[in-house]
Amino acid sequence: AAGLFCAAQLAKCGGKVVILDNGKKVGRKILMSGGGFCNFTNMELSSGRYLSQNPHFVKSALKRFTQWDFIGLVAEYGIPYHEKELGQLFCDNGAEDIVNMLLAECKKYGVEIALRQSISAVAKTENGFSVVTNGETLYCTHLVVATGGLSMPGLGATPLGYQIAEQFGINVIAPRASLVPFTWRECDKFYAALSGISLDVAATNQHKTFTHQMLFTHRGLSGPVILQISNYWQPGESIHLDLLPYNDIR
């Protein structure tokens, strides 16, 4: 999503832009997001809701491009959407609407898209950068690395972006899993009998408390509250679950 959107914006400003994608089609992660309906923005955006070691960047980024800017683009393409709890906006018809919108923006401004690309080398040149892909060397004055994280390798995720960053001396924070479910230990697997049951809980660790829906699965615990608390959980820490968060039984 970031690569497609960035490419369209750069081309809109007059640049000649080429996207190199290692997949057979673009936007595959978008199609998986939001359970297939793409939670494309949130009505309650603020810098305090982001985990970042540089909060000033978050403030400046959100000031320059707000949720309303993206909502306006969605409305321009006539994409129907609805608001769920906590200000989340989802497509009515499915995530493919967002992919098609981004592709239409790229096409409108003349962005070229090359698929099934295997980048083997990136280097700094006198006038910009060189990129070796599929045995061919391409040259550019500016290079944007928008490879995303390491999640979902089956959809093409690779460590290439991290490798390029390290190659050019950019400090890389060791990646760790976040927004992820928790899996049962072997001794806890009897809870799998509860698979499919969901309820509101308060999940607390040493740093944060979130109150939202939790889902029992055959492999462990999931749902919005678990995905949120996973951002703050550290290996070895305990998480306390209050199954009656709205009741004081004292």
What are these regions (language model features)?
Residues R64-H142:
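Feature captures the FAD/FMN-dependent oxidoreductase FAD-binding
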Residues K24-V26, L31-M32, T41-S47, N171-A174, ...:
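An anion/pyrophosphate-binding glycine-rich loop and adjacent beta-alpha core
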Residues G35-E85:
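Glycine-rich active-site loop/strand segments that organize a redox cofactor
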Residues K16, E112, S238:
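Residues at the starts of beta-strands that form the adenosine-phosphate
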Residues L20, I119-S120, T137-G154, A165-E166, ...:
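Short hydrophobic core segments
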Residues A1-I19:
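N-terminal Rossmann-like FAD-binding beta1-loop-alpha1 element of flavoenzymes
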